[in-house]
Structures are given as C-alpha cells and as structure tokens.
Amino acid sequence: MENRMISLERNTNETQIDLTLDLDGSGRYEIDTGCGFLNHMLELFARHGRFDLVLTCHGDVEVDYHHTTEDVGIALGQAFARELGDMRGIQRYGSFHLPMDEALILCAVDLSGRCTLNWDIHCTTEKVGDFDVECAKEFWLGFARSVPATVHFVQFAGENTHHILEACFKGAGHALGAAVKIDEAHKDEIPSTKGLLV
C-alpha cells in the first residue's frame, strides 16, 4: 500500500500555513507555528499518532495565538479529510485513555463525516506560558469541523494545566492513529451500514 501523504497550503489575511502530513509515518515532525506551546503540543500529537508532520505557520501572533491555533487545527483537519477521502478501508473509530502524571484524559474519535466536539476539560489556569488555554478548544473545534469528525475529550483527573493539555494532544494522537489504520479484512469497504459517511 502506498503511503497516505498529502501537502497543502492555507492562506488567509491572518495566517499562512504550509503542511505535509503522512498518515503512515513513524512520528517524525518539523513544526514552527510561532507559538512554542502549540509547537510542543503538535510534536506530541505527531509522535504518539505515528504521523509524520511538517508544518509552518506565519500568523498574526502580535495580536495573540488565537488565529494561529484555530487555523492550524483547520488545516490539519483538511489534510486528514483530503487524504482519507470517503474513509474507505479505515477503522473509523479510535479511543485512548492517556495518563500524564496526575492528569487522566479520554480522547475518543469517530471519523463519521459529522462534526461534534465535546470538550469536557477543566483547566486550572487561563494560560500556559503566553498561550491562552481556551485556544486548545478552538484548535480541536477547527479540526473537527474540517474533517468532519466527532471528537470527545473527557477529563477524569488533573490539576496541572500543562499536563491536562498534553494528555489531550497525546491521547488524540493515539485515538486518531487507531481510527485511520487500514482494516485489512475490509479495506475496500466504507465503514458504515449506510454505505456513506456523512
């Protein structure tokens, strides 16, 4: 099977994004978004999902990181959508409980063709460094809308905001890594009784 790799650009008046994603990679990454914390989260996502991800974003970070974070989520979702197409042959579902020290997060995904984000995450601070914590939800909302996909994050424990968000991105990597795997026994089938995912 050929590697499932895609490159895309997404340019607006607020951000310019170049992205290459290999769904069948080994977890290699080169990421520069202009936001150190977002870089860190995307590196964790790629490593734990075993995706190869090369991404640069030039955004209006002199304002804040909102546009950069949201638009990177949108672009990453678009990359998944374009590469997976009609979702033929994939497992479709993935879930993972990720412990990060005192934090415990569940991420569950359904590459369903329908957008839902359940963000049941309760951070204890509004910022990690200079990153606004609320931007993490905007990232995953942009991603879920662009695939489109159903994505659930549920927090069972956690006090340290960095640990909570790190567990979210690592868990999402594991869950999406499982969801995009090819089902060798049914690789020519769309994983739905409807015959269509929408």
What are these language model-derived features?
Residues 1-198:
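N-terminal intrinsically disordered, cationic/polar leader segments
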